């Protein structure tokens, strides 16, 4: 049975293990379900640009962090 590498598995043996682990943590935070600060709905928030987040339900748009909305 092989290792479970997750989202960073696409890099294979390249770039070093510590860089891949840090990148994996950041990307997992980015793609998890986030809650809208306006309508409090979870799972409808998407990133439309670096630091710009949008709620598909209520249409709210706000500036957040690069990989997380708050």
Curated annotation (Swiss-Prot):
GO cellular component: ribonucleoprotein complex; ribosome
UniProt keyword annotation of Metal-binding present: yes
Name the record gives this protein: Large ribosomal subunit protein eL43
Gene3D superfamilies: 2.20.25.30
Positions of disulphide bridges: none
Pfam families in the record: Ribosomal_L37ae (PF01780)
Zinc in keyword set: yes
Complex formation: Part of the 50S ribosomal subunit.
Cofactor mode of binding and number, as noted: Binds 1 zinc ion per subunit.
Function: Binds to the 23S rRNA.
Zinc finger boundaries on the chain: C4-type: 36-58
Molecular function GO labels: large ribosomal subunit rRNA binding; structural constituent of ribosome; zinc ion binding
Annotated positions binding Zn(2+): 36, 39, 55, 58
Keywords of the record: Metal-binding, Ribonucleoprotein, Ribosomal protein, RNA-binding, rRNA-binding, Zinc, Zinc-finger
A biological process from GO: translation
HAMAP family to which the protein is assigned, alphabetical: Ribosomal_eL43
The gene coding this protein: rpl37ae
InterPro entries: Ribosomal_eL37/eL43 (IPR011331), Ribosomal_eL43 (IPR002674), Ribosomal_protein_eL43 (IPR050522), Ribosomal_zn-bd (IPR011332)
Family: Belongs to the eukaryotic ribosomal protein eL43 family. Putative zinc-binding subfamily.
NCBIfam families tied to this protein: PRK03976.1
SUPFAM superfamilies: Zn-binding ribosomal proteins
Cofactor: Zn(2+)
Taxonomy, superkingdom: Archaea
